[in-house]
Each structure stands twice: as structure tokens, then as C-alpha cells.
Amino acid sequence: LMKWRIFPYIFFFSIYKHVSRYNYEWILLQNHNYNKSKIVEITNSIFREYDIRGIYPEEINEEAVCYIAKAISIKCEQENIKEICVGRDGRVSGVSLLNALSDSLSKYGIKVVNIGLVTTPLLYFAAKKSDHKSGIMITGSHNPKNYNGIKLVINDKPVSGSEILKLISSKKQMSKNPAEIVDKDIKDDYISEVVENIKINSNRKIKIVIDCGN
């Protein structure tokens, strides 16, 4: 009888050792946005020093992004930011992740300016030129196509994944009146700015190399 009583603890300890060996800790969160009976698991490993990044959908997915959005809204509140630009790269998972992010930010009272499919520099340009100086890029960066993640700047300052991790379990009530989600095309403004800042002698012959990989 004693053997069977201690068996669950031995089993748990062996699982813990196996998980710890791969430095793979999980945050268990009650999902209030969708199904109250469902527990959402988010692995700590996606919260990096400079960004948030993981394999889709095992490590980062729409439900995880909803919790990340809540943490971002808390960070925005701390910085007195009420509006933020969002964009995505060309990964297939980017569309649904961006929609989940925008919807959650709106529900937590943050106005979302969706600039759509853009490069990361263009997202940073949009953030810099806006009054709120804040932006979120859905991108897996240089990683393979099954990855995706988030790069973040708030109030003209980069925000690390570890900062968001500290806020992920914090509580915040959803707004009774969700904030706006608006679409904006900023590509022409970006191109004009680039052209204005690059002076080329029209008499000089130049060679131009274009990398179309991304």
C-alpha cells in the first residue's frame, strides 16, 4: 500500500527531472478569454533576451499570444501608452497570430494600428513616426518557417521577452469598451523617407543587388 502511495510522487519527480534536463519549464494559466475550463501552457523558453520566439503551434500559438497581449497591455499602461502599431512578416501563421494579438490588445483597452505585411524595419519606422512610439512585430526573424514570435518596442524603448515574462501571470480586467483596431498603409511614407535620405549622383553608374529571400 505504501508503495502505491509514493508512486505518484516518484512519477512526478522523474517527469520533472526529464523536463528540467531540457530547461523546459511551463507556465500554466487559466484561459479566461475562450474556455474557462481550459488550462493554457506557455513554455518559459520562448521568452528570450531580445524577443519572444518559438515553434508554431507547439510553443507559440493564438492562445499564448492572447496572454502575451495582456502582459504587453500592462507594460503599455506602465508607460502611459494607449496606442500601438502592429505588423507581421510573410509566415503563414502570422495572419492568425496578428489577429489574436490585435483582438486581445483591443479588449485590454489598447488602440491597435494594423500596418499589415511589412518588414521589421518598416514596423520600427511606423512606431518611431507615431505619437505613441510603440510597435509589435510578429516575426520568426531568421528562424525556419515553423517558428514565429514577437519583437517589441514601447515608448521608444525595446522590451525584452524576459520583461514580458514577469508580467504574464499578472491580472488585468478587460475593458468594458474595447479600443479601436484600424488598418493603415505606411509603405509610401517609408519609401519617401528612404528616398529623401539617400542622395545618389545621377551621373554615377552604380550596381544594385537585391536580396529577395525575405
Language-model features: locations:
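An N-terminal, well-structured beta->alpha segment
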Residues: 38-103, 107-108, 183-208, 212
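Gly/Ser/Thr-enriched, mixed-charge loops and adjacent short helices
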Residues: 148-214
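N-terminal small/polar loop signature for handling phosphorylated ligands or for N-terminal nucleophile
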Residues: 83-147
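Hydrophobic alpha-helical signal peptides and transmembrane signal-/tail-anchor segments
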Residues: 8-15
